[in-house]
Amino acid sequence: MTNGWIDIKNTDMMLIMGGNPAENHPCGFKWPVEAKLHRNAKLIVVDPRFTRTATQADLFLQIRAGTDIAFLGGLINYAIQTNRIAKDYLINYTNAAFIVKEGFKLPEDGLFSGFDGHTYAKDTWNYEEGGNVGPKTQSTTAGVAPTSPSTPSGKSSSETAGEQKKQGEQPAANFERKSEPVSSQPSTPQKGGDAMGQGHQAGGPVGAAGQGGQKPPPMLPANVSYDLSLQHPRSVFQLLKQQYSRYTPEMVERITGIPQDQFLKAAELFTSIRKDGDMKKAGTIIYAVGWTQHTFGTQIIRTAAILQLILGNVGRAGGGVNALRGHSNIQGATDMGGVFDIFPGYLKIPQPTDTDLATFNKRTTPTSSKPSEWDSYNYWSNTPKFMASFLKSLYGDSATKENDFNFHYLPKIDRKFSWTEMWDEMYSGKVKGLFAFGMNGVAIGPNSRKNIEALKKADFLVVCDLFPEETAEFWRAPGTTPEQMKSINTTVYRLPGAGFAEKDGTFVNSARWLQWKYVAVPPPGDAKVDQEILARIFLKVRELYQTQGGKFPDPILSLSWSYTTPLNPSLAEVAKEINGKALADLTLDTQPGVTIKAGQQLPGFAWLKDDGTTSCGNWLYSGSWTEAGAQMQRRGTEDPSGLGIYPNWGYSWPANRRVMYNRASCDLAGKPWDNERRQVWWNEMQGKWVGNDVPDFKVDSKPSDHMGPFIMNAEGVGRIFGPLAAFADGPFPEHYEPVESPIANPLHPQQSNNPVARKFTSDLDKLGTVDQGFNVVCTTYRLTEHYHYWTKNNPMNVQLVPEPFVEIPAQLANEMGITGGEKLKISSARGQYIGKAMVTKRIKPMMIDGKKTYQIGIPIHWGYRGIKEDEHETGLTPANLLSPAAIDPNAYTPEFKGFLVKIEKA
């Protein structure tokens, strides 16, 4: 989350899509209810099913699974055409005014510029080099006026842009310069400054080419060309406007199935917070895995971020783009590098070309890219400090400046090692073994049949879990005969683990809060806590290297393991190690008179060094366990601001700030957009930023410095346009159909799917079509009464919901003669799922591009091991036997939502 659970109570407007918090996050859902009760906030819910969350909505819209970008793109188009945008914010806090390189092409045919048939060359996905190319005398703000008097659903707001392009004309400018302020707060600094970049002369020639020789990798220009009037046809804003002019209410209806009048109600309601230029109100967007689990999931979230940027909702109390994490510690697992392509703190993994630490730092450390008159904190410029400190935490005294802090010990990945690709390589015989800790890979899927067959080809499998589950017992999957079992040569080791109540440690919630938890009961029998199991394995492996040698043992032998109890490290010790400590006496220019002595805990990541004098396991968590104690254990209930900040409860990364990018909660002069929800502000007397929250900003940067509020971006501003390699599939989001779809993409039928989505090609990776009889859209979901695949082993949960079912529309059931409770067989091109029919009016038929289309929903919580499974009272069919192994090219998440099935009576 950019904000946090409690902050939702501060909002005036909520859009919940891709999530069902009333059922899946019932404790957290109290905060949307608080906002409705105490702020009269409005709630819009968009979902394939009418859920418990939808019962609380002021407006509910049923959407076809996998069409969220079309809906959100329609909202962007509506906001622009009706002049409901945050004008000052847009110009000064986003890259809307930046000029994009000549040669960049929007995907009117489904492809951005640079596509070679397999991937994108991204040279044109960049900014133009230069200076101010707009009018030399510009006002602080730019007012928005529609390009024509037509309604948002009329031809001239969408088709005209395309006609202009066909005729070779420049798109009509959507902005006109105005001299009057557009918000109730002053929009220019009180002292010595204009709006960012105002009035400066143009810089060097736009688009100047480099000299001959080998073409270097494209980089962001140091001095970006810009136009504060936003009239330049290649300004990010004009390209944004052109991109989403195609997303008319008519097109939204064709793709999503949402009737135009209902879409316009949602668009009118959500953008009403910016009616008449008002900047006091804030709106939030809340989502969960219903957005992430698509072959374009990252771009769905990007579309929401763009919408929030043009509405000025990011960095503000009651605003943001807020992810509801699906497990209690998914956030912490990601923060600590629990995926293949990052280290803790979101540091990048080295590549084979990173021959030394300096080369790695040069590749991964961004340099500022902005108009020369603006300023950018560019906090990722500290990457060398973060990386050196991380290496010191790994290798201790053996990591020195002279040996690059043992950088050469790190693995250099030469291809993708995502979850789905790992299983694909196991199926092809390349991966020989798997350690599965608290992870039921067969049930999780996708394409569970392929995962089962992959495990049959492995040499060994180690499973640490609480119960017998599908992965540990893949060999007894339904359909496996005794003779086939005998032919399986995989050795399976089962290790009894400890449940969450049987071990201490931390949870990091969706709001980025680190909170310490204590042991309630000891693990039963031979069960052991995770760190003891991992420690025993590591120490035995190290012993084998010490006694028997082996290929390149140095990384294992040099690893620092200086815990008081090596066989069972204290997690308090580990937490302190992650926070970091000084390895020599430290001082900071910004904190004169303060010295951190060697051996002391670091007070925060500002103290990290690149010279080997600091050690830190995760720079984001630095400050969580200081000399003052375990900040994550704090339970202070003081909330002086009333905004739900609770600064003395736990620890929120980074730096205990609760709302990220909170400089954007103020105007250019440093005054809050809304004085009733004051987060941070500029204090002229003190010469620094102060507030109820920790300023997410360079604390002494004056408003007149024109420093952008988005300090983690090289540009210093929010990215409406995502340049270069920021995204694999386009600098703007575009609607693509799921890999299995009932229709061709109405925007560009010749390019229906994401052209760079990863699709697998083994004999078990089959895709279905409507012509093959797979004519129903299926989505998966979770129930309040169950927790993934654990609780099917708990009698109380099983009593509440004992067996799998299929949520089927009443109209479809009537057409097929299906009655409630009747057993159904749901088939995809990959497998079958057996469950009883739950005939419901919560899912209705939809008109998709003129064709009547049905959707169904199935919960994910069952398989072939569990209480009811062992009693043979279920179909023994995991839901992910149905789902396809096709993944998002950015986050590598499989497409568990929106695939095609057919329905038969079992």
Give a label for each model feature.
Residues 46-52, 466-469:
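Short, polar loop motifs at secondary-structure junctions
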Residues 5, 490-495, 500-523, 860, ...:
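Glycine/threonine-rich phosphate-binding loop and adjacent beta-strand/alpha-helix elements that clamp
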Residues 55-63, 472-474, 496, 513-524:
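Short beta-alpha connecting loops at secondary-structure transitions
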Residues 54-55, 59-277, 366, 374, ...:
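Long, well-ordered, tryptophan-enriched scaffold segments
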Residues 463-469, 473-476, 484, 522-538, ...:
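Phosphate/diphosphate-binding loops
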Residues 92-96, 269-270, 288-290, 320-331, ...:
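A glycine-rich phosphate-binding loop feature that marks nucleotide/adenosyl-phosphate handling sites
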Residues 532-586, 690-695, 699-702, 710-716, ...:
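Long, contiguous, secondary-structure-rich segments that constitute the structural scaffold
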Residues 1-34, 39-41, 145, 149-163, ...:
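Extended redox/cofactor-interaction regions of prokaryotic respiratory oxidoreductases
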